[in-house]
Amino acid sequence: MKLLFVAGILLTWTCCSSPPMQPLEPAFFCWETTLHVSAEERSLQDSLGCKKLYVKILDIGRNAGSGEIEPYSRTDMSDSSGLKGLRIIPTVFTTNEVFQNISEEKIAWLAGKIAAVATEHGSFEELLFDCDWTPSTRDAFFSFLKQMRKKVPPVARISATIRLHQYKFPQKTGVPPVDRGMLMFYNTGDVDEESERNTVFHPDDALKYLEGAPKNYPIPLDLALPLFSWGLIFREGELWKIVPGPLPLEDMRSNGKWIENPLTDPFTAQLWELKDGTFLGGHYLRPGDHLRVSAISPALLFKAASLAQKLDLADDATLAFFHLNIAGSAHFSAQLLDSVCKTVRN
C-alpha cells in the first residue's frame, strides 16, 4: 500500500511538472556596411556553437532634400570567406520616417525593391525588419509587412524587431503581422539626456518595462542582448554626436586632456569632461564638451540575462548578440556567452 502511495505521488509530480525548455540558439548580428567575418570572430562563433548570423543588408530612409525613399547604405557582401556553414538572416533597417505619409502603391513598390535585394544572395529561412514604428506609422508599417509576406517565398519567415515599449504596451502600439518578433532588450535610456545612467542598458530602467507587461506576447519572441558601447558627446547640455565604441579609454586616461569622473554605481555610464581640444571618432571636440560612455560589462550582461528570465520567449527562441565585433567583444568569451544563454533559460 505504501509503495502504491509513493508511486502515486511520483506519477502526479511527473504529470504536473513542466518539460524542460529548449536551450537558446546562439546567434550574432552583423551591422557593418562591409560584411567581413574575421578568423577571430568566426572562432568565437564556432566555439559558442553559433550557426546563425543576422546580416544587415540595407539601411533605408528618406532623402533630406527631396523626401524620397532611398537606401542610405547597402552592405557589401562580396566577401563570403568567413560565412561557410552559417545560416544568413537578411536584416533590413528602415527609419520611422519612411512610413510617414506613404501611399499603398509606394508601400508595394518598396516591398518589391527590398525583396529583390534580399533574394540576390540565394534562399533564406527568415527576413528580419528593424523599424521603431510609432502610432502614426503603425498602419503603414504593418501594411508593408503584409506586402513583404507576398513578395518572399512562402517557406521564409517574416520577422520584426520589438522595442521594450512595444513589448509592454501591445494594445497601444500594435503587434506586427509577422511570424516572429526579435525583442531588443537594450537601449533602455534616452540618448538626448546627459543625466541618463546608461543608455545602452540599465537594470532599473529595463525593469520598468517588465513590470505590468502582458504575460503572453501574441507572437513567438526571440531575444537580442547588447555587446556594444558608444560615447554620447554633449555640447552646452545638448547631444551633439554619437561615437560608436569601443572608445580609446586608456589613451584618454593618459593624454592629460580629459577629466574622468568616478562611477556612481557599477552599471552607470562614465562621464568624461574635456580640458583641451582633441579629436574623437573623427570629430573635433572643444574644451568643455562632455562625453558619456555607455558600455556593457560581463556583470551587466549577466544582469540583463537574469532579468530576461521574466520575458515571454518562444520555446525555440534564438538569443542574438548585438553585434559581432571582436574589438568590442574582447571581454566576452564563448564560455561566458554560453553561460549567458543558460542564465536566460534558468
Description of each model-found segment:
Residues 319-346:
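Acidic/aromatic/glycine-rich contiguous surface patches that form carbohydrate-binding/processing clefts
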Residues 36-62, 117-124, 310:
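Catalytic domains of carbohydrate-active enzymes, especially glycoside hydrolases
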Residues 21, 28, 59-183:
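Chitinase-like catalytic core of GlcNAc-active glycosidases
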Residues 234-304:
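Glycan-binding loop/region signatures in secreted carbohydrate-active enzymes
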Residues 49, 118-127, 171-190, 246-261, ...:
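Structural recognition of alpha->loop->beta junctions
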Residues 53, 129, 181, 223, ...:
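Conserved, mostly hydrophobic/aromatic
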Residues 146-249:
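Substrate-binding surface in catalytic domains of secreted glycosidases
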Residues 12-15:
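C-terminal motif of bacterial Sec signal peptides marking the signal peptidase cleavage site
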